[in-house]
Amino acid sequence: LQFLDLIQEGNIGLMKAVDKFEYRRGYKFSTYATWWIRQAITRSIADQARTIRIPVHMIETINKLNRISRQMLQEMGREPTPEELAERMLMPEDKIRKVLKIAKEPISMETPIGDDEDSHLGDFIEDTTLELPLDSATSESLRSATHDVLAGLTAREXKVLRMRFGIDMNTDHTLEEVGKQFDVTRERIRQIEAKALRKLRHPSRSEVLRSFLDD
């Protein structure tokens, strides 16, 4: 897969995150979006470089596990543990761990990387101090698309969302903390946040993300 293809897959995942994110739950958008982006890129690589054939019944189980994982991620604001997944799916924890292991399919170290396909995936993971292409593509697509989307908001709306969801910051901020920054009440910040998120969901605002679906 070419690097730009990975970027495109990551942005498709980001668009899904924007569409499905429920801000009222109070969790960081960056955490939720990163999960979707990583899943989209990983799935794309696996589709192009599968080395082990998974039985149909196991694929169905993996799909169910992924679906429930997304639900629990939205509910808890973090990825669920195998123990939590086992409880929700009414399955033994050891079976959950087995499914998770199978889902992480081995990727051939000979998988071509780059426009000229003269490099291979193995070339990029020999030095563990370097960032993997997958992580690099995830980070770049999230930064780029998020910047473009927020640029369509007013300066105040964009700053409120950046502070609330920890975008380009070390941590997110509470309604009270953001309110102090703007010298307004927490309720006013809640209103600004809600209005900004409604704008992001409008087709005219999400065009920058939807364009990545066009061939």
UniProtKB/Swiss-Prot annotation:
- Write out the residue ranges of the motif Interaction with polymerase core subunit RpoC: 5-8
Q: Give positions of region: Sigma-70 factor domain-3.
A: 60-136
Q: Note one Pfam family from the annotation.
A: Sigma70_r3
GO annotations of cellular component type: cytoplasm
Q: Where is this region: Sigma-70 factor domain-4?
A: 149-202
InterPro entries the record matches: RNA_pol_sigma-70_dom, RNA_pol_sigma70, RNA_pol_sigma70_r2, RNA_pol_sigma70_r3, RNA_pol_sigma70_r4, RNA_pol_sigma_r2, RNA_pol_sigma_r3/r4-like, RNA_pol_sigma_RpoD_C
Region named Sigma-70 factor domain-2: 1-51
Task: Provide this UniProt record's keywords sorted from A to Z.
Answer: Cytoplasm, DNA-binding, Sigma factor, Transcription, Transcription regulation
Residues of the DNA-binding region: 175-194
Highest taxon in the source lineage: Bacteria
- Biological process (GO), any one: DNA-templated transcription initiation
Q: Where in the cell is it found?
A: Cytoplasm
GO MF annotation, one:
DNA binding
Please give the function described in this protein's UniProt entry.
Sigma factors are initiation factors that promote the attachment of RNA polymerase to specific initiation sites and are then released. This sigma factor is the primary sigma factor during exponential growth.
Q: Which family is it part of?
A: Belongs to the sigma-70 factor family. RpoD/SigA subfamily.
**Quaternary state and interactors:** Interacts transiently with the RNA polymerase catalytic core.
| PANTHER family (UniProt xref) | RNA POLYMERASE SIGMA FACTOR RPO, RNA POLYMERASE SIGMA FACTOR RPOD
Q: What is this protein called?
A: RNA polymerase sigma factor RpoD
Gene name, Swiss-Prot/TrEMBL: rpoD
